[in-house]
Amino acid sequence: MPNIFKILLIVLLAVVSFRLSASTGDKKTANDGSGNNSSAGIGTKIKRIVTAGLLFTSLATGGAEAIGRSNAQGGNAAGLVPSHLTNRSMAPPPPPAQFEKGAATRVEKMRAQLRELAEKMTDKDPKRLSPSGPDPHHH
């Protein structure tokens, strides 16, 4: 079971990093000289991606915890495992507590990284809008 969530988290990280690397190319042409910023929306796009990532990871941990709990009771969460496998008396039940702790800390680390990333992006936004132009607060 934990492998599914590892794969999902890796895919999520790959998507986020790909989108970030794709959007950094615009920074060179962000300021067109007249003070108009052609790529002002990048920061908000990144924020949206990060919040989507946070939503996704919280859903993933919720699912992981549900599966861990129902496996402890000998049940089958959302029919992910065929019943003839779960009902076998030979198969020892997985250790759900250990798995839940592992998944939770892993996702917490990821959430922290995403939050830091979001903060970095929001810090850069005002400086990037007019690096050589007048102070953005004085219009």
Curated annotation (Swiss-Prot):
Coiled-coil region list: 100-125
Protein name: CLAVATA3/ESR (CLE)-related protein 1
Signal peptide start and end residues: 1-22
GO cellular component: a single term: extracellular region
Gene Ontology biological-process annotations: cell differentiation
Keyword line: Apoplast, Coiled coil, Differentiation, Glycoprotein, Host cytoplasm, Secreted, Signal
Ranges where the record places region Disordered: 66-139
Biased composition annotated in UniProt, kind: Basic and acidic residues: 106-128
Top-level taxon: Eukaryota
Homology family: Belongs to the CLV3/ESR signal peptide family.
